[in-house]
């Protein structure tokens, strides 16, 4: 988790214990549930592990590799911005898309033609994607 930890330092932050635990569990292939207060860094606890793994891959597979479901559009926007921020700094070639009911037809078409590495979406939008 060297690159992600360094990214935190560059932001003027220190990883929280629960974030480090999540990163470790992810690298060990474990599943779990994360419960922490609003604004405590849950997004980076999960995305940090995903990006760290991607950082070491020489050739990234095409298509969506990480799907993030959230029930609220506003939260989806915040998560997409946070995950893209980290991705842009550590793995600029990996994009994080956003798909909600507000996504334009032209953007949906682009997403279909060239899927991003990560996609943040709502259950309703995922349902429409899978139809």
Where do the protein language model's features map onto the residues?
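Conserved P-loop/Walker A NTP-binding site and adjacent catalytic elements of P-loop NTPases
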Residues: 2-131
């Amino acid at each position: 988790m060297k690159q992600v930890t360094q990214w935190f330092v560059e932001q003027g932050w220190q990883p929280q214990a629960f974030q480090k635990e999540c990163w470790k569990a992810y690298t060990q292939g474990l599943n779990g549930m994360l419960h922490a207060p609003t604004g405590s860094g849950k997004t980076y606890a999960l995305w940090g592990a995903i990006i760290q793994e991607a950082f070491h891959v020489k050739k990234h597979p095409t298509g969506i590799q990480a799907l993030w479901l959230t029930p609220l559009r506003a939260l989806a926007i915040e998560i997409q911005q946070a995950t893209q921020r980290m991705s842009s700094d550590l793995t600029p070639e990996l994009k994080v898309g956003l798909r909600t009911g507000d996504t334009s037809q032209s953007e949906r078409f682009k997403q279909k033609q060239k899927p991003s590495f990560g996609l943040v979406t709502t259950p309703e939008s995922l349902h429409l994607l899978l139809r």
